[in-house]
Amino acid sequence: MAWLIMEEEEVDGIPVNEFGRLEIGFDYGFDFTGIVTPPVSTDYDVTLYAKLGLYCYNFQKGTNLKFVRWEKYNTSTGTAYIDNYITLEAMDPSCNSVFSFQTVFSAAGCYNQDTYHVQDWRVLACRPTCGKSVNEYFDRHEAMDPFYTGKMPKWLSDDALAFDNKKYYVVQESDLHENDWLLVFMEMVFLQEKSCVSSSDHKAIIRKTMDGVPEHMSLEIALVK
C-alpha cells in the first residue's frame, strides 16, 4: 500500500451563508426517522466515518480524543451527496472521561481524472454533542489556494521514487503507532478501492483541505490504477 498526502492549513475569512439541511439532524438529536443502531452490516464504514470526525476535531483543537464506539446514525441522501449523522462515544485520555460526540460525514461526489478515480469525502461537523446549528456550506474556491482546488497531483514516477527522496517520506512502523490517523486514512483508501480496484497492489493520493470554517474538512482520495 502506498499513498501521497497533500495538506493545506485552515484559511480565515470565508463567507458563511445560511444554515441548511444539516441543521435538521442536530435539532432532532439525530433521532428522526431512519435511526440505525449497532450491530449492522455497515459497522466498519460508520466506525471509519466517526474516527475521521474525531481526527478533524483533534487536528483543529489540538486535542487527542479517542474513539470508543458509535451509538447511532442516520443518513440523508441528495442527488450529489450522502450525509451521515453519527453520534458516538469519545474518550479524553488525559482524564479518562467518556462523553457523547457528534459528527456529520458526507460523501460529496466522485469523478474521473485521467486514469484516477477520485472520491470527495467531507466532515461538515465534529464536536461534543450540543444543540448548535451546522454550517453545511463548504467553499472550495474562494477560501483556498488554487493549487489545492485544481487537478489531483500525479503519482511520482519510478525514477523519482528511486532517486529523489526529497519529494516523499517513507512511513515507518513507529509513525503508524504514534499517528493513528495514518491508519484511518489508509483504511479509507481500502474502503473506497474495494469496489473499484481488483489488484492486490494499491496506490492512492490523498489531498486534505479545509475552508476555514471550524469543524470542516475535505479528503479527496484518488485511486491510482
From Swiss-Prot:
<protein>
    <recommendedName>
        <fullName>UPF0725 protein At5g63820</fullName>
    </recommendedName>
</protein>
<comment type="similarity">
    <text>Belongs to the UPF0725 (EMB2204) family.</text>
</comment>
<dbReference type="InterPro" id="IPR006462">
    <property type="entry name" value="MS5"/>
</dbReference>
<dbReference type="Pfam" id="PF04776">
    <property type="entry name" value="protein_MS5"/>
</dbReference>
